[in-house]
């Protein structure tokens, strides 16, 4: 058994979760923040047999879209920086961790 942590942009959560459900895979959803801009994210916890890990990753890849977004440059400059013109940055996609499960009980 494996535990897959899939961290996705909150905008992609519904699509990823729906894709997992279509594949017969259930996930526990946790709200999280992170990244350089402290963007809202969702961490999906997915317990699955070893042979389903690749399927989980493929579903996450399919429904976690990378995209570009403009943010104020003051977000990435020093706090006292005078410039505030928009800067284009890449966001989205998924960060996935796969770990072994030593023991699993559903009580």
What are these regions (language model features)?
Residues 1-107:
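Positively charged, small/polar-rich N-terminal and surface patches that mediate targeting and assembly
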